[in-house]
């Protein structure tokens, strides 16, 4: 099929045929993006995409549209997609903005904070007295094979504000990558802005993802 398409259709026409939406719908969803943003949206090959950009550069917009493109333009099911953030407010905002693009299907996308995701994995209810070690514990359990694969089997991991990752967060991401050999990682952050530096966050972890 791919050889046939490549032989008889050229350039942008090939891309249009490979999409799961009409050209008109594609323009409606992605037509206002810049060339660089479209490049990120249409990248289906890179195992790890790290987008480092400052405030006002449209990072959130790119990430929301990337989520939409994964679901609409690629063969990624909602249960195969995980997005991790560092605040509930950010998770809520992403869910709402994704709903504006793809409708109620956004409800089925797993968008959580690092801590809430790890509490879910460990089967515990989060509380302020037991937050500090939950991410490290989850990473350890994944590495030790103590978490069922159906709970952690993902094909795409999206990380918001990746510059805020600390060693435990990076360990969790590394553990997920280790058990999902073909999992793609998309990390977006601003290496000049690190509000969690006091607890060991470092933008170096964002860049280590692509090494």
Can you say where each PLM-predicted feature lies in the sequence?
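Short basic/glycine-enriched coil/helix segment immediately N-terminal to the Walker B
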Residues: 43, 133, 140-157, 178-181
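Catalytic P-loop NTPase motifs of RecA-like helicase/translocase cores
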Residues: 40, 58, 70, 118, ...
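P-loop NTPase Walker
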Residues: 1-127
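Basic/charged alpha-beta structural segments of nucleotide/phosphate-handling enzymes
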Residues: 1-13, 146-152, 157-158, 189
